[in-house]
């Protein structure tokens, strides 16, 4: 689950590009819902919004690493 302590950059680097895109889509939907809850005063845990935004940044970072060739899926699997 996004925003949890179990989602680390290492875990993200082990995912395929397709799975990263799915996780990114889910995280963006969650941010939308959390922002709506925050605006209406229903958000109980403000830290959750911050955690999900950071997860989105982590996903974008891993995707960018692959785009510019810093890391690839094969490198992470072999290590």
UniProtKB/Swiss-Prot annotation:
GO CC terms? cytosolic large ribosomal subunit
- Highest rank taxon of the organism: Bacteria
Q: Which UniProt keywords apply?
A: Ribonucleoprotein, Ribosomal protein
GO terms of molecular function: structural constituent of ribosome
What Pfam families does the database record attribute to this sequence? Ribosomal_L29
Question: What are the BP-aspect GO terms?
Answer: translation
Family indicated by similarity? Belongs to the universal ribosomal protein uL29 family.
> What is the protein named?
Large ribosomal subunit protein uL29
The record lists the organism as: Tropheryma whipplei (strain TW08/27)
Underlying gene: rpmC
